[in-house]
Amino acid sequence: MSKSTAEIRQAFLDFFHSKGHQVVASSSLVPNNDPTLLFTNAGMNQFKDVFLGLDKRNYSRATTAQRCVRAGGKHNDLENVGYTARHHTFFEMLGNFSFGDYFKHDAIQYAWELLTGEQWFNLPKDRLWVTVYETDDEAYEIWEKEVGIPRERIIRIGDNKGAPYASDNFWQMGDTGPCGPCTEIFYDHGDHIWGGPPGSPEEDGDRYIEIWNIVFMQFNRQADGTMEPLPKPSVDTGMGLERIAAVLQHVNSNYEIDLFQKLIKAVANVTGATDLSNKSLRVIADHIRSCAFLIADGVIPSNENRGYVLRRIIRRAIRHGNMLGAKDTFFYKLVGPLVDVMGVAGEELKRQQAQVEQVLKTEEEQFARTLERGLALLDEELSKLTGDTLDGETAFRLYDTYGFPVDLTADVCRERNIKVDEAGFEAAMEEQRRRARESSGFGADYNAMIRVDGASEFKGYDHTELTAKVTALFVDGKSVEQVTAGQQAVVVLDETPFYAESGGQVGDKGELKGNGFTFTVNDTQKYGQAIGHIGELASGVLKVGEGVKAEVDHARRDRIRLNHSATHLMHAALRQVLGTHVAQKGSLVNDKGLRFDFSHFEAMKPEEIRKVEDLVNAQIRRNLPIETNVMDLEAAKAKGAMALFGEKYEDRVRVLSMGDFSTELCGGIHASRTGDIGLFRIVSESGTAAGVRRIEAVTGEGALSLVHAQNDRLNELSHLLKSDSQTLNDKVRAMVERTRQLEKELQQLKEQQAAQESANLSSKAVDINGVKLLVSELAGVEPKMLRTMVDDLKNQLGSSVIVLATVAEGKVSLIAGVSKDVTDRVKAGELVGMIAQQVGGKGGGRPDMAQAGGSDAAALPAALGSVESWVTAKL
């Protein structure tokens, strides 16, 4: 009996654990502190700083089953997903890693033992082929002489991509950084399937499938292209779980493995589909994996960066559901089946299931409304079309503004025998991609970052000032030996009391003083294992090797401590009041207050906000001790400590406890007891995205200042209304009700005035070939009344074209109305657009009703004067 996908995953981890590898949990799909990546797309991403020498672990061998997404940027598989046997937006990458430990010999031997060993995967040896980089004789000889693979099944692959080291068998992290040759292992499905071995003209067939890539990191590529040998060569490997599962389960497509078959049946169940071979089922089964895990890792649908990619995947899945016949929301219903099928690998998803379902449902409902608006706009554009092709710019505008997929636009057009300019659409899309690349923070060059050898010892938990030595200076990213007065610089010390920004807490400010110099620290940041003090030399000369007195801004630090401790109390209170689905999605803790983003699917009710505030203040009054303990990460999680979103933890972590109320992993600076916080007040609660809420709050003196300000406003209001605080509410309520009544009466008067104006205007209409034309500028009429007047006049005049305009505060407002029987000749949108162009504005709308605005009021009479000849030409 073949192994299940879950058993294959576990067997891989067990094998490498038996070879002395540390089993490391999958990292977030949102890369931690890595500006070069949109999503985690490979197993090595979480070890990138280790390979770069910027981070150290207490192990030199690791193995993971890493969740990955490839659906944006360089690695974009989205359009192929569902239509090929092996493309996915979400997949799991099995990997083993050596950080300066073993190299080519052991890496190859381990791979061979796992793949062919009887107690492991037990694949037939004669079905396995390998490739090596053309000049990598060492790897070739290991495969041939030690493993025993015949020469005819070992293929050398050279530079096949038009540049030196540009090869399928030479891996590089980016344009610069660690790189090296790789060896790939292929499985031969047999001659009953078309395709040739790697390197042959038929290599794109499905017979020979790559199952494992083993990268030998030997070099550090410089900006000028030169290759410098790494002091400690390393190994990075990757084997797609879905691919090896297909091989071990004796199927030719990843979508035929047990995991996908269960999901495909679940998709069919919620959409009502009966043909289980329909490719749309594959698309949706793949997309629910990427969407659910991205949301669980903190990504929310939006119109930029990661959120935009997520939105595209969700909407692609929804469209395929519609193609299958789904009439109602269905996508969110697949989260439960996904949790079941992922098992232990989906524990975090299970904890956040309700939140993920709510975000998906909200997005699905929003897209349904978007589709309706998009179809209306498309109908209008097609009604104006004179040829048989819809231009690419319009198709792109539908896609960009309404999320209207171009293939759906093409489907609608096809029903009317209209083509879509797909080349024009692609050109507009590429222009958007170019702008996104230019404005994006992704794609940083690691060699351009400050690189610091050595580390700084942080002593800020116990000290706010100490004497230290300058170990490095940087100006404009370059290492220097000294800094002079007025220069901006980064100062690195051997030890420091300054806290570097991390976990949402801002970096410390303060001063570094010494022999005739003062350096003002405006921020503190981490650079690998070093801590950089960012600021300006106020006076004197500062040199590497000098002694300094490092002094943190005490008062500012104290305010930050209170706010950070209050954040932990509030997090725990939110989980008590709203539920355990609440998870931190981001935070900012500074000396002014705190900002906390968390998962919750609706706005908090006033009574819920009050409960959270009361609960936090109750813990403050209890004056609980705030204690820290350092322990293993796994032990901390077992204790129930919550981890903070977006934070990267070492193997030994600080666990912060506030009595029996809160336990979290945190490396930040905190108060000694909860009573130090004094007072906690919530300033605001708002939404930042679907399924994400934000609370802003203040503590201590800041909270007291807020109370004073609120009391001052209350007293001022009481004085203005000649009321005391007890009767103030009743007085304001009565005033609001009276104002409402007066506004209603005023609106009625305006409508009566508009009706009278309409009656007077109808007599001024002129007849043009049986159609009444009325053009008029009205004084003293509110712009929003023009539409009502146009509707009245259309009813009075019958077949008609009406243009009304008014000027308010120097701005022109225009409304054009055309009776239905005339819209085949005169379209309101075109008419109002012609007028708007003359008054410095723009507008649009339906063929029977359109509106516009403009800024050139002086040009209005002439613009209105041009209407009669324009309409006459159409009639």
From Swiss-Prot:
Q: What class of enzyme is it?
A: ligase
Q: Which Pfam families match?
A: DHHA1, tRNA-synt_2c, tRNA_SAD
Alphabetically, the GO molecular function entries are: alanine-tRNA ligase activity; aminoacyl-tRNA deacylase activity; ATP binding; tRNA binding; zinc ion binding
State any GO BP term from the record.
alanyl-tRNA aminoacylation
**Reaction(s) catalysed by this chain's protein:** tRNA(Ala) + L-alanine + ATP = L-alanyl-tRNA(Ala) + AMP + diphosphate
The entry's function note states: Catalyzes the attachment of alanine to tRNA(Ala) in a two-step reaction: alanine is first activated by ATP to form Ala-AMP and then transferred to the acceptor end of tRNA(Ala). Also edits incorrectly charged Ser-tRNA(Ala) and Gly-tRNA(Ala) via its editing domain.
What are the record's GO terms for cellular component?
cytosol
Give compartment(s). Cytoplasm
Q: What PANTHER family has UniProt attached to this entry?
A: ALANINE--TRNA LIGASE, CYTOPLASMIC, ALANYL-TRNA SYNTHETASE
CDD domains given in the database record: AlaRS_core
Q: What is known of its domains?
A: Consists of three domains; the N-terminal catalytic domain, the editing domain and the C-terminal C-Ala domain. The editing domain removes incorrectly charged amino acids, while the C-Ala domain, along with tRNA(Ala), serves as a bridge to cooperatively bring together the editing and aminoacylation centers thus stimulating deacylation of misacylated tRNAs.
SMART domains, from UniProt?
tRNA_SAD
What cofactor is this protein dependent on? Answer: Zn(2+)
Keywords in UniProt for this one?
Aminoacyl-tRNA synthetase, ATP-binding, Cytoplasm, Ligase, Metal-binding, Nucleotide-binding, Protein biosynthesis, RNA-binding, tRNA-binding, Zinc
Q: Which residues are recorded as binding Zn(2+)?
A: 564, 568, 666, 670
Protein's name according to its UniProt entry: Alanine--tRNA ligase
